[in-house]
Amino acid sequence: MKSNGKDVLRLIASCALLLTVLIGAASAQQPAPAAPSTQAADSGPGVSGAANAQAVSSGVSERERILLERIERLERRLNELESRLNATAADGGKAAAPTAQPLQLTNVAPQQNPAQPTATTASQQQPAQTTQAQTTRATRKAPAPAPAPYAAWEKDGVKIIPFGILIANINYNSSGLDPGSIVGFALPGIPTTANQFNISPGNTLLGVDIKWPKIGKWEINGKVDLDLRGPTPLRSNNIFAPLFIHVYGEAKTERYRILAGQAEDLVSPIYSNSLNTYPFSYLPGKLGFFRPQVRFETYQPISDDFTFIFKGAIAQAIQTFQVADEVIGDQTGLPDGQMRLALGYGKPDRRDQYHRRPFELGVSGHFGKRRGLQLGIPLTQRDLTTWSRDIDLSFKIGSKLRVNGEFFSGSVLGDFAGGIFQTFNPVRLVGIRATGAWAQLTYDISDKWQVNAAYGRDDPFNRDLALGQRSLNEMGFGNFYYRITPRLWIAAEFSHWKTKWVGLPTGSAFRIEPAVLFFF
């Protein structure tokens, strides 16, 4: 507090105390034959005290002594007040509560009737009542508590956070789909193709996030998760075995990320909201899977709202989606190269399941070699080039509507889920070229309700195909998700699948699939 403020405070307090002392002293020295108390009350305490002081000259020295003693007490109290004010200023306002208490001067203030509080007492009670009322209103308006954070194990500064999605699907297919509980394509429309019914927990996802202590600005993390579809998900139906999805470690900052291990491909990175193989949903036209890789990413802001994104990876060849036994694709001893360039607008939405931005447009592609071995007499072997070029778009319109879509073209795409999972022509041993695309509309009706509608197609080049291979795969679906709680959802999906075959009847099926999802 400034010095002139202290002097003013001291002067005001001294004048008030002096006036009170004069009134008390005059009343104490008033002689018996003085005017009645009612007259003194009508005249006011100050006037009465002054008249008595002039009438009783013999008591002047006594009154001066009393005044001097009380002035000394006042100075001591003022010094104490000044010390408290200085302490308050030094403590940044934390000592405001003690200094807010009214100044109590012993033997100066007259006794009050407890039934009639003074103005000071009333002013103390009013803030207390107001604070209590505000606290009550705030308590009533407080939102419901958020779900408790996920439990974590911690040892030597390393956190291990288990997570998962327990998923139970019930599905009915009006005709044969491959493999059945999940869908890659429709089986040929021949008499032996029958309808199907499945109850499956195979989409259940289990995993752990691992977080090490930071090294400077770098976060050190890891992830391991798996579902129950097994290493060849298109060749087994409801035969549960681990299919590892992510197994990687990473170091990242706000602008850079380095990853090593198994993770999703860089090409065509958007997922639909279909229940088919949820949460890494598949529909025709979707390219990419998970494979071992070493990856570098950078996110460079080019304005307040726009970000340039570059991702590059060296990846290992895999053959997860082998369907036919005649042709086996394998690596040639060389890695695949993958790259994606994108322009993003806004920040990733942490409330979105996939942390998507309001707008992101990307182009991506890959290049590599595959070695095909045709089983027969004689054995035939040939190396072919696998490649793709891809466009992806995710765009949020307003607060409720989002548009997602991807387009690809390429060759030898079987282990990227392209070309309807076909890599080679087993007769001529040539690579199968294909184009595909999918698009989806998502509408969030409320915090609890979401609806989705999508269509996708995968179209291999007919001249690259042999008899009995698939020439077109189409799928359209509509579904809804309802969040009973943030961690318990129910959903249902209705879809139609249509697959054309070379030399065989077209396969077509309707599919109804309700599901329950529990997140932990």
Stretches with model-predicted labels:
Residues 2-13:
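Bacterial N-terminal signal peptides that target proteins for export
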Residues 339, 482-484, 507-520:
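Outer-membrane beta-barrel "beta-signal"
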Residues 147-184, 188-320, 331-346, 353-355, ...:
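Outer membrane beta-barrel
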